[in-house]
Amino acid sequence: MQLKKAFWKLASLLPXSLLLFLGGCDKKLAVLNPQGPVAKAQYDLIVWSFLLMSLIIAIVFILFTVILIRYREKPENMDYEPPEQHGNTLLEIIWTLVPVIIVIALSIPTVKATYASEEVPKESKHIKPVEIYVTSANWKWLFSYPEEKIETVNYLNIPAGVPIQFKLTSVGPMNAFWVPELGGMKYTMDGMIMDLYLQADKPGSYLGRSANFSGEGFTHMEFEVEAKTKEKYDKWVKEVQQTAPKLTEDKYNEIVKPGVVGRMTFSSHHLSYVDPKSLEYCDYNYYKNKK
């Protein structure tokens, strides 16, 4: 009886604890606020995984509670001795098959979502993606638009409703590019190009950040992603092409040196004199910065 009372007292504290926990959440978590097809697919996977694991936890705790109460030691069965058993084929089959089924139920949607994120979202297969090279440096982000022949630092403009093919690389320590409301993160590494497809469904401002610690300036590696209508995006590109200064090699080498900088805009990009696919990409910047 005392055990039952203690259990129900603890159970009654659960709703109050949950309310206290939720009281600290003054706004939506970015990861749980998908604003594009890639983020939506990953959000659905998170929800499915959470529900399945919650069901498993609930079943385990219910069985644990039932066994704890029903088969606890009582005064009337102090001398009870359970029969000797050498195995139960049915139970052994069940506790072998159930984990296999759980793993399959988690694996199939995970694999499908992972492979789907490595290409243009199926809803936008008919739309040509905008290609943007993303370069992480200590401690800033460079965004190069090869077709538009422009480059930005620490901010990014994209057209809404259009898939974006990001090509990720680095001129410093390994980093991770992440815009939580548009999709999952991916690493940036020297001498490598990693593809990442994202898309914003509607115009808006989304916060991007580094998801990999890279030293003292790590906290400054945030950037704004502004999704614009196609008309406003084209207008912005034209303005940059006509009014922004050129990005010279000297200026580029100054930017990639370790340090914190503000937003910058240029009417040319560093891809015209640096090949990010080359294994000498990192060494090029290292020796240039030593001069």
Swiss-Prot record:
<keyword id="KW-0249">Electron transport</keyword>
<feature type="transmembrane region" description="Helical">
    <location>
        <begin position="91"/>
        <end position="111"/>
    </location>
</feature>
<protein>
    <recommendedName>
        <fullName>Quinol oxidase subunit 2</fullName>
        <ecNumber>1.10.3.-</ecNumber>
    </recommendedName>
</protein>
<dbReference type="InterPro" id="IPR008972">
    <property type="entry name" value="Cupredoxin"/>
</dbReference>
<dbReference type="InterPro" id="IPR006333">
    <property type="entry name" value="Cyt_o_ubiquinol_oxidase_su2"/>
</dbReference>
<comment type="similarity">
    <text>Belongs to the cytochrome c oxidase subunit 2 family.</text>
</comment>
<keyword id="KW-1133">Transmembrane helix</keyword>
<keyword id="KW-0560">Oxidoreductase</keyword>
<dbReference type="GO" id="GO:0009486">
    <property type="term" value="F:cytochrome bo3 ubiquinol oxidase activity"/>
</dbReference>
<keyword id="KW-0679">Respiratory chain</keyword>
<dbReference type="InterPro" id="IPR011759">
    <property type="entry name" value="Cyt_c_oxidase_su2_TM_dom"/>
</dbReference>
<keyword id="KW-0813">Transport</keyword>
<dbReference type="InterPro" id="IPR036257">
    <property type="entry name" value="Cyt_c_oxidase_su2_TM_sf"/>
</dbReference>
<keyword id="KW-0472">Membrane</keyword>
<dbReference type="Pfam" id="PF02790">
    <property type="entry name" value="COX2_TM"/>
</dbReference>
<dbReference type="GO" id="GO:0004129">
    <property type="term" value="F:cytochrome-c oxidase activity"/>
</dbReference>
<keyword id="KW-0812">Transmembrane</keyword>
<dbReference type="GO" id="GO:0016682">
    <property type="term" value="F:oxidoreductase activity, acting on diphenols and related substances as donors, oxygen as acceptor"/>
</dbReference>
<dbReference type="GO" id="GO:0042773">
    <property type="term" value="P:ATP synthesis coupled electron transport"/>
</dbReference>
<keyword id="KW-1003">Cell membrane</keyword>
<comment type="function">
    <text>Catalyzes quinol oxidation with the concomitant reduction of oxygen to water. Subunit II transfers the electrons from a quinol to the binuclear center of the catalytic subunit I.</text>
</comment>
<dbReference type="InterPro" id="IPR034227">
    <property type="entry name" value="CuRO_UO_II"/>
</dbReference>
<dbReference type="GO" id="GO:0005507">
    <property type="term" value="F:copper ion binding"/>
</dbReference>
<dbReference type="InterPro" id="IPR045187">
    <property type="entry name" value="CcO_II"/>
</dbReference>
<dbReference type="InterPro" id="IPR002429">
    <property type="entry name" value="CcO_II-like_C"/>
</dbReference>
<feature type="signal peptide">
    <location>
        <begin position="1"/>
        <end position="28"/>
    </location>
</feature>
<keyword id="KW-0732">Signal</keyword>
<feature type="transmembrane region" description="Helical">
    <location>
        <begin position="49"/>
        <end position="69"/>
    </location>
</feature>
<dbReference type="GO" id="GO:0005886">
    <property type="term" value="C:plasma membrane"/>
</dbReference>
<dbReference type="InterPro" id="IPR006332">
    <property type="entry name" value="QoxA"/>
</dbReference>
